[in-house]
Amino acid sequence: MTSKTLPFHADTVGSYLRSQPLKEARAKFAAGELSREQLTEVEDQEIAKLVQAQLDAGIQVITDGEYRRAFWHIDFLENLNGIEGYHPEHGYKFNGVETKPYNTRCCGKVSWNPNHPFIEHFKKLKDIVGDRGIVKYTIPSPNQLMYPIQWDTGVYATRAEFAKDVQQAYKDAIKAFYDAGCRYLQFDDVYWGSLCNNHLKPEFEADKAQALENIQVVLAAKPADMVITTHVCRGNFRSTYLLTGAYDPIADALFGQTQYDGYFLEYDDERSGGFEPLKHFANNPHKGRVVLGLISSKFPELEDKTAIKARIEETTQYVPLEQLCLSPQCGFASTEEGNIMTEAQQWAKVRYVEEIAKEVWGED
C-alpha cells in the first residue's frame, strides 16, 4: 500500500451518524446510569455493526465512524499532555445554531500522551476489521491548536514556542499509531478553512506560514509505508456550516507545498469557490491524490449524476483524472448530534459515491 493507491477513487471522510443504541447508551452514561465499562461494551458492539454496514455498502476503507467521540477534534486534543477540556461561556457558533459549550486550551507543556486512548481505540477497530478492509483513523490536525484561545493561556511566551511542542507531540503520535499497526491516518483541519474565511486579516500571512510549517515538520516524520491525508473543512454541525471562502488564499501553501498523500476538499456548494486553485498541485512533486467532496453530507437529496461527472471533468483542466477521487464533502456526524438525515439516506449517499467512482475510474 503506497500513496499511489490511497486514497481510493471512492472514499469517505470518516464520521457516520451515531446509531440509536449508541445515542441511548451515551445519554445513560452522562446521567450516571451506565458505567464506563458498559458504555465501552455498547460502543464495541455498535462499531462492529458499523464496520459491517460499510463493507455492505462496498467501502474498502473502513473507519469507526468516530463513534467513541462527542466532537471530531476535542476528544483527541484533550487527551494530549498539556491540553485540557473546559466549558466556555458559548459553544461554536454555526450558521443559525450553536454547539454545546466545550473547548480545549493549553494548561501545561504540550507533549504526546503515551496512554492516549485513541491508540487503544484504533487497535480495537483494526481487530474488528481484520483482513476485510483497510482501516483509516482520523484525528484533528496540529493546526487545530493554533487559535489564540487554545494556546495563549500564559504557559508559552509565543505561539512559535508552543507550535514546536505541538509538532513534536504529533510526530510522536504518528509513531504511536504506526507502531499500533496504523497505515492510513487522516488529519482533519478546519484551520485552513478559517484562513480562507479570514484572508484579509493582517495576521493572515503569519498564520498561513505557521500552518504550513506545522504540517511540513510533522509529515517529515511519516514512515514511507504510511499514508497520511487531510480533510479541509469549513465546519459541519447539524447540517450547517461555520466558514465560507474559496481555496485561493491558501492554495500555494497547502496544495503546492505540503506532502500529504491525499487532500479531501469540500466542493459541494459555492462556499468553496472554483477549481482553479487546484492548479497549484502541478507544482507539488509529491503528487498526492485530490479527493473531490462533490457529494453533500449535509443534505439527503442525491445530486445529479451527470452534473457530478461534468464537475470531475472540469477539474481535469488542473489535475489529471487518475490523480482525482470522489467522496462526500465532509463526515456525516462531526459531532455526536449528527447531520439532519436518516441512516438510510446516509448509506444511499455512500453507495452513490461508490457507483459514480466506478463509472468514472473503474474498479480500484
Where are the language model's segments positioned?
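Domain-level signal for soluble alpha/beta catalytic cores
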Residues: 1-364
